Amino acid sequence: MTGDQFAQLRSELDWTQQEVAAQLGVTRFTVSRWEGQEEVPRMAELALRYLARDLHAELMAHDGP
């Protein structure tokens, strides 16, 4: 995942860099640095995808009857 793709996913989740940083246990500066890189560290990518999946599941549960 490129830094641009990471930033796009973060944006689609409607999260700020600070919110992602808090969820991943890193600084906002680290998230900013990742977004400027050609390739995001694999663990950061997996963590963000996991958070996105959790958020999606939570939203789907609230859309039920």
Where are the language model's segments positioned?
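Short intrinsically disordered terminal tails
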Residues: 1, 60-65
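Residues in the recognition helix of alpha-helical DNA-binding motifs
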Residues: 9, 23, 34
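Short alpha-helical DNA-recognition segment
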Residues: 14-30
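Acidic-residue sensor for enzyme active/binding pockets
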Residues: 17-19, 35, 45
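DNA major-groove recognition helix of helix-turn-helix/homeodomain DNA-binding modules
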Residues: 40-62
